[in-house]
Curated annotation (Swiss-Prot):
Family listed: Belongs to the universal ribosomal protein uL1 family.
Protein name: Large ribosomal subunit protein uL1
Gene (UniProt): rplA
GO CC terms of this entry: large ribosomal subunit
GO biological process per UniProt: regulation of translation; translation
Taxonomic lineage of the native organism: Bacteria, Pseudomonadati, Spirochaetota, Spirochaetia, Leptospirales
Gene Ontology MF, one: rRNA binding
Keywords linked to the UniProt accession: Repressor, Ribonucleoprotein, Ribosomal protein, RNA-binding, rRNA-binding, Translation regulation, tRNA-binding
Length: 230
């Protein structure tokens, strides 16, 4: 793929052989963003563990993601009022089941009470492929819909590695201050290390980098980052 002159010029600002401190990396990633919009700062980290299917969890970012998260809640009765008061964008039971079964997915996160999961489970072909299926481990199958909605709205994100063992996450907008982005990244690393399987051997995080949506990847000193968050 041929790169433009601007990309090549920005790339020269980053020493590809160097692992930067977190503060340096965040500043460089923002400075080498070449989008005309307020891009997202994204992290990529390689997980060193044999059973990747068991590596997943949720992370609450202290400063949110900067995105407006639309939350749908499948629930009945009084729980519907509870969900609406917490800020849910779409609330319902069989009416929403029918709408989603038709392929509608104009929302970013989905919560369900346990008594709705028999019907919600049938939406696997629609919700599953978009990563929207509610799951107990992710805290999205719950009777406490108010807490779930508020956490999702505030920037709670779910993580899982891809087939290559790499976790990709957006951790805030490039317009965030460096300190806020660093706080969010430290929260990600702390959560990953807290969730580290007990039988994981060696360095659990093998590499770590940050980049804007349209920007240059910047390597972070992963050992320094991990040591600051354990």
């Amino acid at each position: 793929m041929k790169r433009g002159k601007k990309y090549i010029q920005l790339k020269e600002k980053v020493d590809r052989t160097k692992a930067y401190t977190l503060g340096e990396a965040v500043g460089l990633a923002k400075a080498t963003s070449y989008s005309k919009f307020d891009g997202t700062l994204e992290i990529s980290t390689k997980i060193n563990y044999k059973s990747l299917q068991n590596v997943r969890g949720t992370i609450s970012l202290p400063h949110g993601t900067g995105k407006t998260i639309k939350v749908l809640v499948f629930c009945k009765g009084d729980k519907q009022n509870e969900a609406r008061e917490a800020g849910a964008d779409f609330v319902g039971d069989m009416d929403l089941i029918e709408k989603v079964s038709g392929g509608w997915t104009d929302f970013d996160a989905c919560v369900a009470t346990p008594d709705m999961m028999k019907e919600v489970g049938k939406l696997g072909p629609v919700l599953g492929r978009k990563g929207l299926m509610p799951k107990p481990k992710a805290g999205t199958v719950t009777t406490d819909v108010s807490k779930a909605v508020k956490e999702l709205k505030a920037g709670r994100i779910e993580y899982r590695p891809d087939k290559g063992g790499v976790v990709h996450l957006g951790v805030g907008k490039c317009s965030f201050s460096d300190d806020k982005l660093s706080d969010n990244i430290n929260a990600v690393v702390a959560a990953l290390m807290k969730d580290k399987p007990s039988d994981a051997k060696g360095d659990y995080l093998k590499s770590f980098s940050v980049a804007a949506t349209m920007g240059i990847g910047v390597k972070v000193d992963v050992k320094e980052l991990v040591n600051a968050n354990i």
